[in-house]
């Protein structure tokens, strides 16, 4: 639900989530946004706060992202 001019005040909320993937940072972001969208209504965007990799046996095993997900509260 985009913010519409002249439609009154919208209240947004931001939650922080962590998501991970064994494939890539992009996959971790997609999984995190998909999961958040299943629980939260009106997700508007996500900001990647931080990202890191977990290394096992000298190789990247996990791509981890820390996201701030914004959603609009509905009355």
Enumerate the language-model features and the residues they cover.
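Short beta-strand/turn micro-motifs at beta-sheet edges
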Residues: 1-7, 56-58
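A cross-kingdom feature marking charged/low-complexity
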Residues: 52-75
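Short, well-ordered alpha-helical segments
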Residues: 10-44
């Amino acid at each position: 639900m985009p913010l519409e001019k002249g439609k009154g005040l919208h209240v947004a909320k931001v939650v922080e989530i962590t998501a991970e993937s064994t494939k890539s940072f992009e996959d971790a972001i997609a999984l995190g946004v998909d999961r958040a969208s299943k629980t939260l209504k009106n997700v508007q965007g996500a900001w990647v706060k931080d990202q890191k990799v977990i290394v096992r046996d000298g190789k990247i095993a996990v791509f981890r992202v820390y996201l701030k997900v914004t959603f609009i509260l509905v009355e």
